[in-house]
């Protein structure tokens, strides 16, 4: 029944809305969930495109929440505020350059060679350990950048290079950029907010590229597939509206250690599942 497929889209949208912003890997969670819950009669080309384009719902939540801050044409902004807005966008562009120069050419290669349980599990664990170790270090080190307006262009570029590491499935785009920011002396609040903004060009760009590749390979969406995708995007948007606000408040009082522990636990479970699956497949 198509109604069941709609329910699956709702589930995928909820997972995307939560895991896109928490540094726990949306791709890793979608790979895991789709091992047990998957659409009927949908080919690999559609699912590859779906898992990326669903992110548009999540990123639109950032645009909605921060529209005033991101809009340089807001009538009541002073010239100084307009200048600050353009400077913010300039930093986002600078931070996006590594993804354009390195990420786009290597995307297919990473997709082909690392989009599997073992790779996802390993990256979940590695970054989980990284979060714990970095936060232990940061207990004795004060951040040097505590205001987004003061974020240096050099630091923005540094964070952008870390974003490229999220090409490894299981890394988490937000996880990679947050780790990069924390290592470079950026406060949790600043790097979290900058991560939200950095996702705008990257996720729109990634979605556009996936759709273009999908079409160029001779594929097309039927009404059912379009419905499944739109439902997932709408749900991801709604859930992201809450999760973004939650994480923004959370990092003001807490560190990322709990996410590190969660990543290690999930990565271990994925490895155990992979081992048992391999054993029983023989």
From Swiss-Prot:
<dbReference type="GO" id="GO:0008360">
    <property type="term" value="P:regulation of cell shape"/>
</dbReference>
<protein>
    <recommendedName>
        <fullName>Undecaprenyl-diphosphatase</fullName>
        <ecNumber>3.6.1.27</ecNumber>
    </recommendedName>
</protein>
<dbReference type="GO" id="GO:0046677">
    <property type="term" value="P:response to antibiotic"/>
</dbReference>
<keyword id="KW-0961">Cell wall biogenesis/degradation</keyword>
<dbReference type="GO" id="GO:0071555">
    <property type="term" value="P:cell wall organization"/>
</dbReference>
<keyword id="KW-0472">Membrane</keyword>
<feature type="transmembrane region" description="Helical">
    <location>
        <begin position="256"/>
        <end position="276"/>
    </location>
</feature>
<feature type="transmembrane region" description="Helical">
    <location>
        <begin position="45"/>
        <end position="65"/>
    </location>
</feature>
<comment type="function">
    <text>Catalyzes the dephosphorylation of undecaprenyl diphosphate (UPP). Confers resistance to bacitracin.</text>
</comment>
<keyword id="KW-0378">Hydrolase</keyword>
<keyword id="KW-1003">Cell membrane</keyword>
<keyword id="KW-1133">Transmembrane helix</keyword>
<dbReference type="GO" id="GO:0050380">
    <property type="term" value="F:undecaprenyl-diphosphatase activity"/>
</dbReference>
<dbReference type="GO" id="GO:0005886">
    <property type="term" value="C:plasma membrane"/>
</dbReference>
<keyword id="KW-0133">Cell shape</keyword>
<feature type="transmembrane region" description="Helical">
    <location>
        <begin position="196"/>
        <end position="216"/>
    </location>
</feature>
<keyword id="KW-0046">Antibiotic resistance</keyword>
<feature type="transmembrane region" description="Helical">
    <location>
        <begin position="114"/>
        <end position="134"/>
    </location>
</feature>
<feature type="transmembrane region" description="Helical">
    <location>
        <begin position="151"/>
        <end position="171"/>
    </location>
</feature>
<keyword id="KW-0812">Transmembrane</keyword>
<dbReference type="Pfam" id="PF02673">
    <property type="entry name" value="BacA"/>
</dbReference>
<keyword id="KW-0573">Peptidoglycan synthesis</keyword>
<feature type="transmembrane region" description="Helical">
    <location>
        <begin position="224"/>
        <end position="244"/>
    </location>
</feature>
<feature type="transmembrane region" description="Helical">
    <location>
        <begin position="86"/>
        <end position="106"/>
    </location>
</feature>
<comment type="similarity">
    <text>Belongs to the UppP family.</text>
</comment>
<dbReference type="GO" id="GO:0009252">
    <property type="term" value="P:peptidoglycan biosynthetic process"/>
</dbReference>
<dbReference type="InterPro" id="IPR003824">
    <property type="entry name" value="UppP"/>
</dbReference>
């Amino acid at each position: 029944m198509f109604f069941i497929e709609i329910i699956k889209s709702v589930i995928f949208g909820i997972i995307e809305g939560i895991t896109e912003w928490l540094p726990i890997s949306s791709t890793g969670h979608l790979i895991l969930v789709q091992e047990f819950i998957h659409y009927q009669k949908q080919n690999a080309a559609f699912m590859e495109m779906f898992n990326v384009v669903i992110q548009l719902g999540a990123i639109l939540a950032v645009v909605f929440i921060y529209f005033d801050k991101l809009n340089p044409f807001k009538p009541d902004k002073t010239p100084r505020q307009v200048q600050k807005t353009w400077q913010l966008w300039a930093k986002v562009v600078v931070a996006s350059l590594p993804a354009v120069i390195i990420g786009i050419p290597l995307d297919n290669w990473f997709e082909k060679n690392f989009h599997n349980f073992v790779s996802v599990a390993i990256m979940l664990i590695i970054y989980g350990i990284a979060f714990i170790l970095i936060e232990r270090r940061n207990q004795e080190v004060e951040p040097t950048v505590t205001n987004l307006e003061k974020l240096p262009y050099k630091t923005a570029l540094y964070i952008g290079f870390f974003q490229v590491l999220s090409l490894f499935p299981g890394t988490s785009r937000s996880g990679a950029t947050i780790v990069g920011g924390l290592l470079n002396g950026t406060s949790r609040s600043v790097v979290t907010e900058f991560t939200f903004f950095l996702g705008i060009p990257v996720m729109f760009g990634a979605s556009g590229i996936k759709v273009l590749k999908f079409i160029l390979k001779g594929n097309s969406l039927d009404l059912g597939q379009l419905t499944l995708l739109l439902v997932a995007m709408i749900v991801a948007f709604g859930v992201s509206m809450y999760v973004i606000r939650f994480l923004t408040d959370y990092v003001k009082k807490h560190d990322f250690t709990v996410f590190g522990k969660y990543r290690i636990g999930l990565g271990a479970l994925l490895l155990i599942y992979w081992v048992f699956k391999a054993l029983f497949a023989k």
